[in-house]
Amino acid sequence: MSVYAIVLFLHIVGALGLFVALGIEFLTVSRLRSAQTAEQARDWLSALGPIRVIGPVALITVLLPGLYLAATSTGWQGWNVAGLGAMVVLAGLGAASNATRIPGIGRSIGVLRGPLPLEARLRLRDRLVWSSVIIRIGIALGIVFDMTVKPEVLGALVVLFAFALVAAAAAFVTGRSAQVLATERSAS
């Protein structure tokens, strides 16, 4: 067994861990959007706890072996440079949206009991949080495509942009329930 094989294995395990974290986040955010009581919302918010460990460990386990592989075997090519940039975007989107907004959502639920008031339900359906997780899943799938097909830099960037665009469209279409609630609120 070579060092290359072990490092590649770690790189792939890191990618799997990243998708586990994104899957937990997707499930949690989608369930938060349908929570009817403060207790349900708190239960689902608590499911995000493991992401605080899995996410950073997965990111490091993708990046360090990936950098090693680029430096020792593949060199810097369009697909891995684009993938590295996309990983930075993934981390930035997660930090800018969910890492800042989810704690605020948790605080807004705080001491509430029983059925959620409309204001709290609107916060649980935050379109930025929903869009962020969907777009990050799309970008992550684009990275996997680039790592598999290994296109030149322009092709790699087009793939990443296309995956992000499709994911953004999916987030827009599926995130409309917040608009429905807002309309419901203004009609009351």
Outline where the language-model segments fall:
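Polytopic transmembrane helical bundles with strong interfacial aromatic enrichment
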Residues: 1-188
